[in-house]
């Protein structure tokens, strides 16, 4: 079974519209920052693939709200990954510093310049 997180966001909504058999969640139906809740949800729904579109996306606000940004962008993906389900994690170009050659490729060195970019990079690693 496929799980799409972040279904209230633009990308999550679009994927939910295309992948109509998927289970779609938002922050109200699944708190990805709560490891126990995530594990139970994945187990109870026989999830074997997760597309993680959930994110703290207030780029500028992340500077002053870094704990919440870290909770959502780092701890959330870590909790999802630790379920054992395969995961597709959506990230951002903010993991790069903007000085590289376009297009960015997965093997390029990252160098986030903001709290938002740093948390998204840590989420990739998680």
Locations of regions flagged by a protein language model:
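Structural signature of beta-strand start/N-cap positions in the alpha/beta core
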Residues: 1, 21, 46-48, 86
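NAD(P)-cofactor binding segment of oxidoreductase domains
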Residues: 64-88
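Catalytic helix-loop patch of NAD(P)-dependent Rossmann-fold dehydrogenases
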Residues: 71-79, 95-126
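N-terminal Rossmann NAD(P)H-binding glycine-rich loop of SDR-like oxidoreductase domains
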Residues: 2-19
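Glycine/Thr-rich phosphate-binding loops of Rossmann-like dinucleotide-binding domains
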Residues: 12, 59-60, 97-98
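NAD(P)H-binding glycine-rich loop region in Rossmannoid oxidoreductase-like domains
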Residues: 35-72
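SDR active-site strand-loop-helix element
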Residues: 5, 25, 50-54, 87-92
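Adenosine-cofactor binding site in Rossmann-like domains, unifying the SAM/SAH pocket
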Residues: 20-41
């Amino acid at each position: 079974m496929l799980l799409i997180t972040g279904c209230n966001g633009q990308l999550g909504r679009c994927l939910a519209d295309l992948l109509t058999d998927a289970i779609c969640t938002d922050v109200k139906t699944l708190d990805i920052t709560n490891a126990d809740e995530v594990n139970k949800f994945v187990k109870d729904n026989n999830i074997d693939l997760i597309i993680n579109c959930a994110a703290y996306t207030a780029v500028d606000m992340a500077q002053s709200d870094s704990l919440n940004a870290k909770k959502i962008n780092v701890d959330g993906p870590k909790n999802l990954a630790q379920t054992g389900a395969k995961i597709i994690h959506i990230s951002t170009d903010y993991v790069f510093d903007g000085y590289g050659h376009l297009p960015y490729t997965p093997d390029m060195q990252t160098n986030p310049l903001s709290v938002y970019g740093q948390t998204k990079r840590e989420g990739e690693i998680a």
